[in-house]
Every structure is written in C-alpha cells, then in structure tokens.
Regions:
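Short S/T/G/P-rich N-terminal loop/turn motif that feeds into the first structured element of a domain
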Residues: 1-37, 41-54, 88, 92-105
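Short hydrophobic/aromatic beta-strand micro-patches
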Residues: 8, 59-61
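Generic structural signal for short, flexible, solvent-exposed coil/loop and linker residues
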Residues: 36, 47-51, 57, 71-83
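An amphipathic, aromatic/His-enriched active-site/gating alpha helix that lines ligand/cofactor pockets
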Residues: 62-93
C-alpha cells in the first residue's frame, strides 16, 4: 500500500538554518535504507522536498502506517518535523474501480 509522509518543520529547525537538523538530514538517506529493513516497508518510492514550504513529501510502499511512524521516529524525522501519514491510491487504480462499478450497474 502506498502512503504519503508529509513532514513539516519550522524555519528555525530547517536543515538549511539549524546545525542539528542538518546533521540529521545529511544522514537521512542512509538511515532510511537501514531502518526500513526493520519494518514492513517495501520501498521508498520517491522523496521530494519544498525548501520554501519547509516540507518533505516521502512516498512509501509499506504494509502498515504504524511501521512508517516508527521509521520516522527512528530516523529523526519526527524530532524536527510534524509528521502526517496519509494512505494514497494511484489515479489509474481508482478509475479502474470506478469503471468496474459502472459496468456492473
């Protein structure tokens, strides 16, 4: 299942402005690769960021949102950001379901 992780931090805790956050950020890719193996996380599909919005958007393929929560805590994401984990669906999958439902009527 796909989940969107929306992690928003303040300008004061931004890795561009805060040395402690910068340290966490620079180690993040390696930490994610190591820590995700502990949980039912299949893959980090994409990792985007909006510097001006102070937000990271991480698309994760996982079984449970609780595993993503643990990942965010273990990697330090939750120590500098407010984290929101949202289940996602692909557009193509939803339109297929809609067509199947329509065809049954």
């Amino acid at each position: 299942m796909l989940f969107g992780v929306f992690a928003t931090h303040s300008p004061e805790s931004c890795p561009m402005n805060n040395e402690s956050s910068k340290e966490t950020f620079l180690k993040l890719k390696n930490q994610l690769d190591v820590e995700m193996k502990k949980y039912n996380i299949n893959k980090i599909v994409e990792f985007y960021m909006s510097v001006l919005e102070h937000q990271w958007i991480i698309i994760i393929d996982a079984i449970h949102a609780h595993d993503i929560e643990k990942l965010c805590i273990d990697t330090g994401i939750a120590s500098t950001s407010i984290v929101k984990i949202v289940p996602l669906n692909r557009y193509e999958d939803i339109t297929k379901k809609m067509q199947l439902k329509k065809n049954k009527l």
